[in-house]
Amino acid sequence: MAVVSMKQLLESGVHFGHQTRRWNPKMAPYIFTSRKDIHIIDLKRTALEIEKAYAALYDIAKDGGTVLFVGTKKQASEAIKEEAIRAGQFYVDHRWLGGTLTNFKTIRQRIKLLHSLYAAEADGTWAKLPKKEVLGLSRQRIKLERFLGGIKDMQRIPQALFVVDPRTEEIAVKEARKLGIPVFGIVDTNCDPDLVDYIIPANDDAIRAVKLLTWVMANAVVEANGGVVEKYEDEENAPFEQDEPRKPSQKPKQNRPENKPRFDKQAPRAAAKPEVKAEVKPEVKPEVKVEAKVAPKVVAEVKPTEDLSTLKVAELKELAKAKGIENYSKLRKAELVEALSK
């Protein structure tokens, strides 16, 4: 029985590669075709290479070898950590520290410091220190735990290295090849397959694809150590399984003709709307009448013109404007009085 089905590979988007302009010609044997300037990986070759890598990793774990899972990309860090813990192996899910393999003695000293900080916190030593010093030690512990937490129990160099995207994990791959450690890797169409001993041509940018392939390789270690392989569960497909029991709940919605008379009873409420409009209309009419009454009052106040000489020039001009005298704005006061008195 195959370790992974073609349907799982297809649904997880394993076959999607990078843009054609970013490809590595060495990946040509693993490319099926290209669509819309994106390479499509041959899933038959992917399934074949997965079988080879699975068998090789199984043999290494069967002989008591340890595996270091490496994936510092955002798309891979979570899956790498979960599957490595499930398989009882080591992992690096954040930045790879240079010399983790080639200078393992120095790394071991940092790991010992991390363990000493754990012990000091557990036995109550930190409680006797000033708060400022405790805060500094706490920050140091968090930093060491972030980069070395996945390998804090690794006593010796691992016998295999599994990486997601050899381009991103270039330093880790170089250190492993320098020490003769076999490298298993998920290689996309923009990577160099020669850097990896056991290539898995697949999409290394999709979370679902990375999770599926990491799950498969972790199963090789679990099976070699006599563990039980868990069934693969895709979180994104889980909601579709929950939709099935909800189907019966839709039937009562179709059997609602009994409730239709209830809505008919509420019809008179809609008829009440014109009544509101009728009340608004008479309120608008008196407002117009009031405005018409104000107009004659203003004219009555302007009419008295007994002593025009006592008025100001501005007032005379307003009267001249109302009377329709031409060029009234250029006339002087005496001329305005004379024109208005005619």
From Swiss-Prot:
Any one GO BP annotation for this protein: DNA-templated transcription termination
Gene3D superfamilies in the cross-refs: 1.10.720.10, Glucose-6-phosphate isomerase like protein, domain 1, Helix hairpin bin
Any one annotated GO CC term: cytosolic small ribosomal subunit
InterPro entries reported for this sequence: Rho-like_N, Rho_N_sf, Ribosomal_uS2, Ribosomal_uS2_bac/mit/plastid, Ribosomal_uS2_CS, Ribosomal_uS2_flav_dom_sf
GO molecular function annotation: structural constituent of ribosome
The keyword Ribosomal protein appears for this protein: yes
Alphabetized UniProt keyword annotations: Ribonucleoprotein, Ribosomal protein
Disordered: region residues: 235-283
Pfam families tied to this protein: Rho_N (PF07498), Ribosomal_S2 (PF00318)
Biased composition (Basic and acidic residues): 255-283
Family membership noted in the UniProt record: Belongs to the universal ribosomal protein uS2 family.
Protein name: Small ribosomal subunit protein uS2
